[in-house]
């Protein structure tokens, strides 16, 4: 909307400002709901991950004690990306988390459960990074 108005050399109209306000309000709602449910999202994601891949918690598995922290960090970065509408913060960290074996997909599944199920379409693209 902004780039289109700029290309035309126009100020934003009231309708365009209202549309932008609605987008920002939705993003704030998403971030607030994820933040409010972050502990449950990560707990449920970890539980699901370990049920699906019990070898992670077996001796020699990849479930180090900092795994929950890593999952929380991924979720925090998703909130940054959601509020900004820009997933580059996730792109910058993707290789690091993949190398560490951090289960971002499990956090994404956690968002899809419980009170956050309506947020899935809003944040799904950020978890695909």
Swiss-Prot record:
A biological-process GO annotation: photosynthesis
Keyword Metal-binding: no
Principal localisation: membrane
Pfam (any one): Phycobilisome
Membrane topology (UniProt): Peripheral membrane protein
Subcellular localization, as worded in the UniProt entry: Cellular thylakoid membrane
GO cellular component: phycobilisome; plasma membrane-derived thylakoid membrane
Source organism superkingdom: Bacteria
Keyword terms, alphabetized: Antenna complex, Bile pigment, Chromophore, Electron transport, Membrane, Methylation, Photosynthesis, Phycobilisome, Thylakoid, Transport
Statement: the UniProt record of this protein carries the keyword Kinase: no
Sequence positions bearing N4-methylasparagine: 62
Changes after translation: Two isomers exist.
InterPro entries: Globin-like_sf (IPR009050), Phycobilisome_asu/bsu (IPR012128), Phycobilisome_asu/bsu_sf (IPR038719)
Binding site for (2R,3E)-phycocyanobilin: 116
Similarity field: Belongs to the phycobiliprotein family.
Function: Light-harvesting photosynthetic bile pigment-protein from the phycobiliprotein complex (phycobilisome, PBS). Phycocyanin is the major phycobiliprotein in the PBS rod.
Subunit details: Heterodimer of an alpha and a beta subunit, which further assembles into trimers and the trimers into hexamers.
Name of the protein described by the UniProt record: C-phycocyanin beta subunit
Source species of the chain: Aphanizomenon flos-aquae
């Amino acid at each position: 909307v902004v780039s289109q108005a700029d290309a035309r050399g126009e100020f934003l109209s009231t309708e365009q400002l209202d549309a932008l306000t609605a987008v920002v309000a939705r993003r704030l709602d998403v971030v607030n709901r994820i933040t409010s449910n972050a502990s449950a999202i990560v707990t449920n994601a970890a539980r699901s991950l370990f049920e699906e891949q019990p070898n992670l918690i077996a001796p020699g598995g990849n479930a180090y004690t900092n795994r929950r922290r890593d999952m929380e960090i991924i979720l925090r970065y998703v909130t940054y990306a959601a509020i900004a509408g820009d997933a580059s913060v996730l792109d910058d960290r993707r290789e690091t988390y993949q190398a560490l074996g951090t289960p971002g997909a499990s956090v994404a599944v956690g968002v899809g459960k419980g009170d956050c199920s309506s947020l899935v379409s809003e944040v799904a693209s950020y978890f695909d990074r």
